[in-house]
Curated annotation (Swiss-Prot):
GO BP of this protein: isopentenyl diphosphate biosynthetic process, methylerythritol 4-phosphate pathway; terpenoid biosynthetic process
Record's catalysed reaction(s): 2-C-methyl-D-erythritol 4-phosphate + CTP + H(+) = 4-CDP-2-C-methyl-D-erythritol + diphosphate; 4-CDP-2-C-methyl-D-erythritol 2-phosphate = 2-C-methyl-D-erythritol 2,4-cyclic diphosphate + CMP
PROSITE patterns from the UniProt entry: ISPD, ISPF
Annotated site residue numbers, Transition state stabilizer: 24, 31, 267, 366
E.C. numbers: 2.7.7.60, 4.6.1.12
Protein name as it appears in the record: Bifunctional enzyme IspD/IspF
Gene3D superfamilies in alphabetical order: 2-C-methyl-D-erythritol 2,4-cyclodiphosphate synthase, Spore Coat Polysaccharide Biosynthesis Protein SpsA, Chain A
Organism name: Sphingopyxis alaskensis (strain DSM 13593 / LMG 18877 / RB2256)
Similarity comment: family membership: In the N-terminal section; belongs to the IspD/TarI cytidylyltransferase family. IspD subfamily.
Amino acid sequence: MTESAAPSPRCVAAILLAGGRGLRAGFGRPKQLEWLCGKPVLRWSLDVLAGYPGLSGGVLVANHDVMAATYPLPEGWMAADPGVERQQSVANALSALTDWPDDAVVLVHDAARPGVDSAVVDRLLAALDGADAAIPVLPVPDTLVEAADGAAGAVVARDRLARVQTPQAFRLGTLRRAHAEASGAAATDDAQLVRSLGVSVATVEGDARLHKLTYAADMAILAGLLGTKDMMRTAVGMGYDVHRLVEGKPLWIGGIEIAHSHGLEGHSDADVGLHALTDAILGALGDGDIGDHFPPSDPQWRGAASHHFLSFAGERVAANGGRIGHLDLTIIAEAPRIGPHRVAIRDRIAEILAIPAGRVSVKATTTERLGFTGRREGIAAQAVATIQLPET
């Protein structure tokens, strides 16, 4: 967790919870990083909250993968580690706000509700003029029944029920006390903990656009609610790398080790495939090349595994609000034969970048015994990366 930052005089902070695993959504990666109408789900909430005029700072609670894809954080924001449960994640964020006074206001919001806007925040802050806590709610439109063993029971009166959303607003001291006295109670939101103190929680009008992303089908619902079309441009980058073959070294190509009498010589593990892909992605971003970010003059990269370089390039795509559309890698070698390893290489590249294997193509060719590759002096690789980036 980063050190606490001193608050500004207005003392309004946000806690953005993005530490959930999202298993029910079934995306194969954190749902906060899924693409929604032109940018990752997490970015919808982060951009609105960080841009809110009355906000003095914030805490993003997220695991390493999500944090790396979101770097750099907005000015005034800090990072905190997630807990096993939501309640612990909020407690970790509160620890990052140690220097903030009890009369400060804190907004607690779930990143899985990307439709937050300034209007609902305005209503919440206004409600705190006469309360220690406020939450957005919507009426329940459906008929509700008790259900058990596959049978419908009595109808539940809905006129006294409401759907609770986030963000939720609290006086910081009240929320601190609620978490301190929670004693491990499992609460689904922070208002539940605050109510256990006997504190009245005000309600304000919610927003249908604060629909929660829980299942994969919710993506289509949110896309319709947010009413924004993808405004993306396609960028293409090319990469090329070559290394000399030397006897007695391990041979790494495309992130896997291949049994061979010779290996590639270089400052790192000399993986020509991953180096070419890294340069192709960085080229599409207009973000220099592998030597700019991992200079061979830097001893920390001596013997380094090249998957670190490719992973970095993928994180840079995400940090720029982009996504990898397709990668095409060609290995140029007389020996060893690459064909038997193509699937393993493809799958390893997809694993490193956390993208579907169908977005990766791996091919191999020779130079018909011509040139340095034909003489088995070295191996070359060339790559093309196609990525989508937000229009600027």
